[in-house]
């Protein structure tokens, strides 16, 4: 029976995603990833190289999944609200992405920085064009607006204990999840709505 290369790679990436999200790049070992996947460590090295390369692969894949899930780039303030809502939904369903980003920030290296920078600049350019057309508020720089929208959607997952202390509920309560999403959408729209 032939070796299932794609299935093996998928299992290794799933195990690596879970390990890196739980322990960060410094606290994760290749041996633990291989053990979690049920695949020998040598195959892990063969497919992904070293631990840093694997972390970068995992994070890049997770960011690609987010981008595909929340596309397209919004241009009006209502669209920005729904973009923020879709981003919130995705991150609530996939909290490992926010954890991976936090670990990346703590570790100092940036995975696929040139491509990610280009991706974010493209969003900021679309916001800038909408600001020039009067569709979006121009009080904030487009770069700051993009960052703030991402932060609105991500912070609930980044600090769930703070959200629980403030609201008395966690995101497993469907009504609370809906309230949080509505707050994210409303706040994003208010940030982007022209004030004139």
Predicted regions and their residues:
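All-alpha amphipathic helical-bundle segments outside canonical DNA-binding/catalytic cores
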Residues: 114-115, 132-148
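Helix-turn-helix
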Residues: 11, 15-53, 57
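Amphipathic alpha-helical segments that line or abut small-molecule/effector binding pockets
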Residues: 14, 77-106, 117, 143-150, ...
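Amphipathic alpha-helical segments used for helix-helix packing
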Residues: 55, 91-110, 159-167
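C-terminal peripheral helix-coil segments that are non-catalytic and often amphipathic
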Residues: 89-93, 121-133, 151-152, 158-196
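Amphipathic alpha-helical linker/stalk segments
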Residues: 3, 56-83, 120, 128
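N-terminal intrinsically disordered/low-complexity leader segments
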Residues: 1-7, 196
């Amino acid at each position: 029976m032939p070796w299932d290369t794609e299935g093996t790679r998928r299992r290794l990436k799933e195990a690596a995603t879970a390990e890196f999200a739980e322990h960060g790049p410094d606290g994760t070992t290749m041996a633990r990833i291989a053990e979690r996947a049920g695949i020998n460590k040598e195959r892990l090295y063969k497919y992904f190289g070293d631990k840093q390369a694997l972390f970068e692969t995992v994070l890049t894949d997770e960011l690609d999944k987010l981008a595909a899930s929340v596309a397209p780039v919004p241009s009006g303030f209502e669209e920005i609200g729904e973009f923020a809502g879709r981003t919130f939904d995705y991150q609530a369903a996939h909290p490992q992405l926010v954890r991976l980003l936090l670990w990346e920030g703590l570790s100092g290296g940036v995975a696929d920085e040139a491509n990610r920078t280009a991706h974010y600049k493209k969003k900021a350019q679309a916001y800038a064009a909408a600001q020039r057309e009067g569709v979006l508020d121009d009080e904030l720089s487009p770069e700051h607006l993009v960052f703030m929208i991402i932060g609105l959607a991500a912070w609930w997952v980044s600090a769930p204990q703070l959200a629980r202390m403030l609201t008395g509920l966690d995101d497993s309560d469907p009504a609370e999840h809906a309230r949080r999403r509505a707050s994210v959408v409303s706040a994003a729209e208010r940030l982007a709505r022209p004030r004139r």
